[in-house]
């Protein structure tokens, strides 16, 4: 995608110290907060190398001037960040989704982007999940919600 000039948009997931004071939340959300997943002390802190908030080392070479890192989402979807705004301001109407949690974050991003009027395709083999059942559930839902669900190889072939 980068080689063909496509922009990459990243919707990061960060929790800050002040988020530990939330008065309620779902079980998955509480697990993430309790385990300090995606944790940074505050918005102005550099990401600690190797922390849950850091980018995977193999992907870091792709972070460049054609990579737009949105403001962070907090729970699962992009409703609390500026992903849709960034996509629209860059003239994007079609999105190819990939990500680490198919049945929660990828699914939530898919649904919100579709509801916001974007064409959304999912690279199914570029998503992960906490177990096969969760992955299978996500793939089933992608088939109902996404414009298309396909392999990464098919995505690259069609770019």
Regions inferred by a protein language model and the residue ranges of each:
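Short acidic/polar active-site loop segments enriched in Thr and Asp
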Residues: 7, 93, 119
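Short acidic-hydrophobic, aromatic-tinged amphipathic segments that line or gate anion-handling sites
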Residues: 70, 147-158
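Anion (oxyanion) recognition and catalysis
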Residues: 2-3, 114, 143
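Active-site-proximal loop->helix
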Residues: 131-143
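Generic beta-sheet signal
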Residues: 11, 123-125, 152
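A short glycine-rich beta-strand->turn/loop micro-motif centered on a GG-aromatic cluster
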Residues: 96-100, 116-132
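Active-site alpha/beta core segments
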Residues: 1-90
């Amino acid at each position: 995608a980068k080689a063909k000039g496509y922009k990459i948009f990243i919707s990061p997931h960060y929790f800050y110290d002040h988020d530990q004071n939330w008065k309620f939340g779902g079980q998955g959300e509480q697990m993430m907060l309790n385990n300090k997943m995606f944790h940074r002390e505050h918005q102005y802190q550099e990401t600690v190398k190797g922390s849950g908030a850091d980018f995977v080392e193999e992907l870091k070479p792709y972070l460049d001037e054609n990579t737009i890192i949105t403001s962070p989402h907090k729970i699962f979807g992009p409703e609390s960040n500026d992903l849709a705004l960034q996509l629209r301001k860059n003239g994007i109407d079609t999105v190819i989704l990939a990500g680490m949690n198919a049945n929660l974050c990828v699914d939530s991003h898919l649904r919100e982007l579709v509801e916001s009027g974007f064409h959304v395709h999912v690279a199914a083999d570029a998503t992960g999940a906490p177990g096969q059942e969760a992955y299978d559930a996500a793939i089933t839902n992608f088939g109902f919600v996404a414009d298309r669900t396909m392999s990464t190889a098919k995505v690259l072939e069609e770019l």
